[in-house]
């Protein structure tokens, strides 16, 4: 080691290669710069893939929890609701309640099925601490199904749940005091059901407006992020083209 440190050096030779010098030193610098750019781009692509993986896993978890909760509530509501046998319910009300409950349970069970089938495979890959294991995850190929489960669980499923609550209020409160005032729409039960409907309609409208606004904001964010990525790729291309022209000059 001491012999290596005591080797005399030519003062005319540079201590380290600089990009301004011609010859092999300049080519080595260009090659090293090219490898650094390619490596950084490769890591950026892997980071984007892992970000998509974690986003898909979060969506599947939220979809499964929401679907299990709301479908269970709908089933309990249908089983536990007690119809007044002495009261003649309007036929459209019973048909609407039955159809809404069935569609609600079917939609949430379908979303739960998708989440249950895909989530274990995504979890298995996300728990492996290896950057190259991202290619084994099915989240890219199953992306349409993940978005479908997310939409069914959070958008369509919640709208059906709000309609279920309104119909349940009508079935529960409509027979109240109906015997004292037959054929009248001013008894206590009818007024209670009407109040629940009046409250739930603006809530549903607010939910729809918020969903549209959130979706547009999310699309705008993704568009801006993709534009930044395109600009970075363009800068990378310009740098690589400049290095290639420099090599041709050399």
Curated annotation (Swiss-Prot):
InterPro entries: CRAC_channel (IPR012446), Orai_sf (IPR038350)
Site-annotated residues for Confers selective permeability to Ca(2+) ions: 80
Reactions catalysed: Ca(2+)(in) = Ca(2+)(out)
Keyword terms of this UniProt record: Calcium, Calcium channel, Calcium transport, Cell membrane, Ion channel, Ion transport, Membrane, Transmembrane, Transmembrane helix, Transport
Transmembrane feature ranges: 66-83, 94-114, 148-168, 192-212
Molecular-function GO term, any one: store-operated calcium channel activity
Keyword Cell membrane: yes
GO cellular component: membrane; plasma membrane
Keyword Coiled coil attached: no
Subcellular location: Cell membrane
Pfam families in the cross-refs: Orai-1 (PF07856)
Membrane topology classification: Multi-pass membrane protein
GO biological process, one term: store-operated calcium entry
Regulation affecting activity: CRAC channels are regulated by fast Ca(2+)-dependent inactivation (FCDI), a mechanism that limits Ca(2+) influx and cell toxicity. ORAI2 channels display prominent FCDI. Inhibited by lanthanides such as Gd(3+) ions.
Reported function: Pore-forming subunit of inward rectifying Ca(2+) release-activated Ca(2+) (CRAC) channels. Assembles with ORAI1 and ORAI3 to form hexameric CRAC channels that mediate Ca(2+) influx upon depletion of endoplasmic reticulum Ca(2+) store and channel activation by Ca(2+) sensor STIM1, a process known as store-operated Ca(2+) entry (SOCE). Various pore subunit combinations may account for distinct CRAC channel spatiotemporal and cell-type specific dynamics.
Subunit structure: Oligomerizes in homomeric and heteromeric ORAI complexes. Native CRAC channels most likely consist of hexameric ORAI heteromers, implying that diverse ORAI1, ORAI2 and ORAI3 subunit combinations with distinct biophysical properties can operate in a cell-type specific way. Interacts with STIM1; this regulates channel activity. Interacts with CRACR2A/EFCAB4B.
Protein family per UniProt: Belongs to the Orai family.
PANTHER family xrefs: CALCIUM RELEASE-ACTIVATED CALCIUM CHANNEL PROTEIN 1, PROTEIN ORAI-2
Name this protein carries in UniProt: Protein orai-2
Gene, per the UniProt record: Orai2
């Amino acid at each position: 080691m001491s012999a290596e440190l005591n080797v005399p050096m030519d003062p005319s030779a540079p201590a380290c290669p600089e990009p301004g010098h011609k010859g092999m030193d300049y080519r080595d610098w260009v090659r090293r710069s090219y490898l650094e750019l390619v490596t950084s781009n490769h890591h950026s692509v892997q980071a984007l893939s892992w970000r998509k993986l974690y986003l898909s896993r979060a969506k599947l978890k939220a979809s499964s929890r929401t679907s299990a909760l709301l479908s269970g509530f709908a089933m309990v509501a249908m089983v536990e609701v007690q119809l007044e046998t002495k009261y003649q319910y309007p036929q459209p009300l019973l048909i609407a309640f039955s159809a809404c409950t069935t569609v609600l349970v079917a939609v949430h069970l379908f979303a739960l099925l998708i989440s249950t089938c895909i989530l274990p495979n995504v979890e298995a890959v996300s728990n492996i601490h290896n950057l190259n294991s991202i290619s084994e995850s099915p989240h890219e190929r199953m992306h349409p199904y993940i978005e479908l489960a997310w939409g069914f669980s959070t958008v369509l499923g919640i709208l059906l749940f709000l309609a279920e609550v309104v119909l349940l209020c009508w079935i529960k409160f409509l027979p109240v005091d109906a015997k004292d005032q037959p054929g009248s729409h001013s008894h206590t039960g009818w007024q209670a059901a009407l109040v629940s409907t009046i409250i739930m309609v603006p809530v549903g409208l607010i939910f729809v407006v918020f969903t549209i606004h959130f979706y547009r904001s999310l699309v705008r964010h993704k568009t801006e992020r993709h534009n930044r990525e395109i600009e970075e790729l363009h800068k990378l291309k310009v740098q690589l083209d400049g290095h290639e022209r420099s090599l041709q000059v050399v």
